[in-house]
């Protein structure tokens, strides 16, 4: 059974809707568990003194024809974030490829620097294979992903604030 998690997304002052993702627990158990727990907030407060929880955090970088990046709940600008295992953890494996839209993959700052930042692909991104760990995919709400992309830009700056207003696990 794959874990299923959700994000309720707000764009500006409007409720955009829900994105449901399945996590590839069998291929990337450690990475999937980190993301699942950050969706529920069940691990409490991290070393940075902030809750280990995506709720209320932003998609700080959205590049059209590429991806939407979020998960920096400590600084909100792409320089922060924290995993449930401590600040950073190793790349689990590169078994899965960035071969389609709607994939969930870990953002990083180089090898073995996974924290809480992630991205959702808008297109196949083969140049990321072997550098970023794919650990899940969108199973409902691809149209919400399109709304995220419509609020992005080539620079990554968003036109309006894109917020994870709620998130959790679907049992």
From Swiss-Prot:
Keywords assigned: Isomerase, Rotamase
Isomerase among keywords: yes
Enzyme class: isomerase
Pfam families: Pro_isomerase
Superkingdom to which the source organism belongs: Bacteria
Catalysed reactions, semicolon-separated: [protein]-peptidylproline (omega=180) = [protein]-peptidylproline (omega=0)
EC number: 5.2.1.8
GO MF annotation, one: cyclosporin A binding
Gene Ontology BP terms: protein folding
Record domain PPIase cyclophilin-type: where: 6-169
Cellular component terms (Gene Ontology): cytoplasm
Record PANTHER family: PEPTIDYL-PROLYL CIS-TRANS ISOMERASE, PEPTIDYL-PROLYL CIS-TRANS ISOMERASE D-RELATED
Family the entry assigns: Belongs to the cyclophilin-type PPIase family.
Function: PPIases accelerate the folding of proteins. It catalyzes the cis-trans isomerization of proline imidic peptide bonds in oligopeptides.
Protein name: Peptidyl-prolyl cis-trans isomerase slr1251
Organism: Synechocystis sp. (strain ATCC 27184 / PCC 6803 / Kazusa)
């Amino acid at each position: 059974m794959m874990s299923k998690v959700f994000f309720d997304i707000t764009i500006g002052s409007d409720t955009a809707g829900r994105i449901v993702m399945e996590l590839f627990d069998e291929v990337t158990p450690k990475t999937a568990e980190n993301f699942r727990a950050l969706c529920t907030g069940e691990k409490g407060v991290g070393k940075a003194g902030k809750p280990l929880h995506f709720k209320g955090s932003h998609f700080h970088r959205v590049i059209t024809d590429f991806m939407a990046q979020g998960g920096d709940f400590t600084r909100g600008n792409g320089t922060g974030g924290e995993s449930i295992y401590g600040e950073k953890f190793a790349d689990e494996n590169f078994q899965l490829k960035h071969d389609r839209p709607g994939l969930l993959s870990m953002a990083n700052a180089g090898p073995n620097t996974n924290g809480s930042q992630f991205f959702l692909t808008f297109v196949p991104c083969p140049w990321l294979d072997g550098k970023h760990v794919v650990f899940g995919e969108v199973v409902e709400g691809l149209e919400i992903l399109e709304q995220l992309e419509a609020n992005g830009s080539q620079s990554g700056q968003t036109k309006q604030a894109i917020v994870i207003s709620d998130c959790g696990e679907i049992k």
